[in-house]
């Protein structure tokens, strides 16, 4: 039976291939920026604060994501380092993007005299939703898949036929780990938004820390299924190690910060008053 494999190239512009991976990633980023800008206005910041940050944050995130990937796949680039600059076929690591974007955000908020924790809280739900969307770029690139399985297993998950067909990689069916993470991230987005709206529940900074806890917990287990993991040394998967560290660190930070009686709740009206009068 011939399977209808998706084409990773969406179209060609003046002979230059434009990949679905890039289109999906950009779409996720655009949605994240729009959602973050709306939340920024609700807590007393300006839309331009979000848009201006993207001038810093997006390049930093892309560079961080690429350097992170290349650092652990150096053997693929050592003989032809010019390939480091070619990202249309993938090769971006989410954790590297978070590190690069996080550093840019720290310096940006300091430069603008904006609370770093507030900005992180604004962005966190949008970021995890963008990650959920971005995983479909992996699907279009036929990457980020799991161990070998059977078509019957995939059918038992009640997946659409186009997903099942495209989990056939080189004649072998694989588990759709991209989909597992995408669904996990969508659930995380819903949880974070609901908790963020709940008055007097989350303290400032805890939306972001909740994102770290949720994402790293799911990523730890999903990463264990992936066939294309980056390895630090021996059989230690980089993303699993980093997920474990971030999960524990985020919980510890929440506990320590909760001991501060002056720590404010993430409350839009109070936060708006505080920001606009400072």
From Swiss-Prot:
Keywords in alphabetical order: Cell membrane, Membrane, Transferase, Transmembrane, Transmembrane helix
GO MF, any single term: phosphatidylglycerol-prolipoprotein diacylglyceryl transferase activity
GO biological process: lipoprotein biosynthetic process
UniProt xrefs under Pfam families: LGT
Enzyme class, spelled out: transferase
Subcellular location: Cell membrane
Broad class of where this protein is predominantly found: membrane
Membrane-spanning ranges: 13-33, 50-70, 89-109, 175-195, 205-225, 236-256
EC numbers on record: 2.5.1.145
Keyword Cell membrane: yes
Binding site for a 1,2-diacyl-sn-glycero-3-phospho-(1'-sn-glycerol): 135
Keyword Transferase part of the UniProt annotation: yes
Membrane topology (UniProt): Multi-pass membrane protein
Pathway: Protein modification; lipoprotein biosynthesis (diacylglyceryl transfer)
Any one GO cellular component localisation term in the record: plasma membrane
Summary of the function given for this chain in its UniProt record: Catalyzes the transfer of the diacylglyceryl group from phosphatidylglycerol to the sulfhydryl group of the N-terminal cysteine of a prolipoprotein, the first step in the formation of mature lipoproteins.
Family the UniProt entry places it in: Belongs to the Lgt family.
Protein name (database record): Phosphatidylglycerol--prolipoprotein diacylglyceryl transferase
Native species: Enterococcus faecalis (strain ATCC 700802 / V583)
Species lineage: Bacteria, Bacillati, Bacillota, Bacilli, Lactobacillales
């Amino acid at each position: 039976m011939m399977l209808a494999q998706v084409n990773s190239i969406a179209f060609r512009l003046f002979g230059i291939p434009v990949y679905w991976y890039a289109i999906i990633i950009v779409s996720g980023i655009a949605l994240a920026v729009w959602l973050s800008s709306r939340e920024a206005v609700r807590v007393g910041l300006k839309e331009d604060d979000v848009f201006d940050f993207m001038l810093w944050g997006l390049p930093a995130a892309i560079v961080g994501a690429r350097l992170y990937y290349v650092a652990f796949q150096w053997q693929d680039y050592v003989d032809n380092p010019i390939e480091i600059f070619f990202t249309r076929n993938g090769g971006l690591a989410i954790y590297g993007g978070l590190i690069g974007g996080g550093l840019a955000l720290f310096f940006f908020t300091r430069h603008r005299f904006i609370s770093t924790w507030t900005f992180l809280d604004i962005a966190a739900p949008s970021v995890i939703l963008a990650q959920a969307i971005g995983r479909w770029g992996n699907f279009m690139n036929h990457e980020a898949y799991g161990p070998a399985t059977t078509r019957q297993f995939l059918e038992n998950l009640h997946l659409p036929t186009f997903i099942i067909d495209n989990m056939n990689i080189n004649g072998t069916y694989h588990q759709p780990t991209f989909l597992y993470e995408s669904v996990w991230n969508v659930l995380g987005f819903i949880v974070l938004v609901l908790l963020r709206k709940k008055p007097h529940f989350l303290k400032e900074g805890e939306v972001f820390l909740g994102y770290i806890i949720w994402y790293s917990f799911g990523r730890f287990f999903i990463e264990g299924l992936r066939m294309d993991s980056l390895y630090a040394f021996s059989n230690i998967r980089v993303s699993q190690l980093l997920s474990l560290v971030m999960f524990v660190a985020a919980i510890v930070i929440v506990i320590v910060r909760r001991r501060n009686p002056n720590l404010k709740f993430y409350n839009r009206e109070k936060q708006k008053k505080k920001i606009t009068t400072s």
